[in-house]
Amino acid sequence: MTIDDDLSRIAEQEKVLSFDAFDLTTAWQLGKLLQELATERGLGIAIDVTLHSMPVFYAALPGVTPDNVNWVRRKRNMVLRYFRSSYASGLKLQKDGKTVEDNGLSGADYAPHGGSFPINVKGSGCIGAVTVSGLPQRDDHNLAVEALALMLAKDLDTLRLA
């Protein structure tokens, strides 16, 4: 797939993977679902669900390093800044031949890499982010999308990046 193909598919993901309502219980359920998927698959990832600026769920599974904590924070910052997935932001920067620094941001605080996805509520927009770190960035992104699709009973095959 080309960057444009991925950006188009991610835009569709961000549109389709929107909740009617989302609260602290839903946030915990999303984090727990990701933890269960990762554990079943033996994935060493860090998982974070944040609403606004409030951490709701965090898990570090075997294989995670202290670096993953920082990657989670930096990827989440991309979502909370641009209200779109960190992977889409990174692909757009790559397509335009730019970096986060070109937008006046610090690479120490913003990571335009896959793995953080906006938590969107219909009629409200982005209220937080779900973030995965520990796999290659495309896999981090796909895992977050998979969990959202499962929670929202959406067809993952039509949403997943190839």
Curated annotation (Swiss-Prot):
Q: Which Pfam families match?
A: HbpS-like
Checking SUPFAM superfamilies in the record gives: GlcG-like
Question: At the top level of its lineage, which domain of life is listed?
Answer: Bacteria
Q: Which InterPro entries match?
A: PduO/GlcC-like, PduO/GlcC-like_sf, YBR137W-like
Question: Which HAMAP family has this protein been placed in?
Answer: UPF0303
Q: Which family does it belong to?
A: Belongs to the UPF0303 family.
This one is known as: UPF0303 protein RL3365
Tell me which species this is from.
Answer: Rhizobium johnstonii (strain DSM 114642 / LMG 32736 / 3841)
